[in-house]
Amino acid sequence: MRVLGIDPGSRITGYGIIEKIGNRLVHVDNGAIHTDSHREFALRLHKIYEGLSRVIEEYRPDAMAVEQVFLAHNAQSALKLGQARGAAIVAGVSAGLPVSEYTAMQVKQAVVGYGHARKEQVQQMVKSLLNLPEIAQADASDALAVAVCHANSAVMKSVLRSIR
């Protein structure tokens, strides 16, 4: 199963792609889509949509996982972040991908085993799980963590279905 994880942002949207092969997690790619904060906001949303659409077309993931971000410094920031999430989700849905959403606490729990883990702990565990020496951008690291969360959650959902 190939998973595209997304860490949405109106200025920087991180993405990370992993593959679950048996019980191993394999890093495929990661990066970020940068938008110009001086451009019209609708054009920035379009850049997020187009950028993720290209990533989806190139890597052909089986699923998309998006972090639910609800912390913002003010109402305007929260609205912009929600719109960036929407652009990312529409890119996935337009490509026919199932889209799942996870809170930051769920991601931390799945990656580190502790829902209140610090950002550095999550980044360190992502590097360890994916056998990476470094991850260039924090946004990409967060996106990889979301992908790991989804891959592990999908396995658990499958196990629970087989028990029932």
Swiss-Prot record:
InterPro entries: RNaseH-like_sf, RNaseH_sf, X-over_junc_endoDNase_Mg_BS, X-over_junc_endoDNase_RuvC. Keywords: Cytoplasm, DNA damage, DNA recombination, DNA repair, DNA-binding, Endonuclease, Hydrolase, Magnesium, Metal-binding, Nuclease. GO terms for molecular function: crossover junction DNA endonuclease activity; DNA binding; magnesium ion binding. It comes from the Bacteria. Gene3D superfamilies: Ribonuclease H-like superfamily/Ribonuclease H (3.30.420.10). Its EC number is 3.1.21.10. It is found in: Cytoplasm. The RuvA-RuvB-RuvC complex processes Holliday junction (HJ) DNA during genetic recombination and DNA repair. Endonuclease that resolves HJ intermediates. Cleaves cruciform DNA by making single-stranded nicks across the HJ at symmetrical positions within the homologous arms, yielding a 5'-phosphate and a 3'-hydroxyl group; requires a central core of homology in the junction. The consensus cleavage sequence is 5'-(A/T)TT(C/G)-3'. Cleavage occurs on the 3'-side of the TT dinucleotide at the point of strand exchange. Homodimer which binds Holliday junction (HJ) DNA. The HJ becomes 2-fold symmetrical on binding to RuvC with unstacked arms; it has a different conformation from HJ DNA in complex with RuvA. In the full resolvosome a probable DNA-RuvA(4)-RuvB(12)-RuvC(2) complex forms which resolves the HJ. Belongs to the RuvC family. This is Crossover junction endodeoxyribonuclease RuvC. It comes from Geobacter sulfurreducens (strain ATCC 51573 / DSM 12127 / PCA).
